[in-house]
UniProtKB/Swiss-Prot annotation:
One of its GO terms (molecular function) is DNA binding. The lineage of its organism: Bacteria, Bacillati, Bacillota, Bacilli, Lactobacillales. Residues 1-15 have a biased composition (Low complexity). Binds to DNA and alters its conformation. May be involved in regulation of gene expression, nucleoid organization and DNA protection. Keywords: Cytoplasm, DNA-binding. It is found in: Cytoplasm, Nucleoid. This is Nucleoid-associated protein SSA_0326. Belongs to the YbaB/EbfC family.
Amino acid sequence: MMNMQSMMKQAQKLQKQMEKGQAELAATEFTGKSAQDLVVAKLTGDKKVVSIDFNPAVVDPEDLETLSEMTAQALNHALAQIDDATQKKMGAFAGKLPF
């Protein structure tokens, strides 16, 4: 069994690696798209919206519901990518905990 000092060193090392992973994710930009790429949302890995771009074909003052649905679709697509990337990058640390 590991002694306490060794466990603490390993935990500190893992914490630094996790912080680095979180910073890398935050600096990464993810792009989500609606059907036919009519709405494109760009978010950072820490889930901050960078931009939302609309194809003029989807902007119809008489049909704002479709624009709203496509915007939500694009945002959810980007958020799913962020969640997947986070799980891949940060999930690896769960098995490395010394306790």
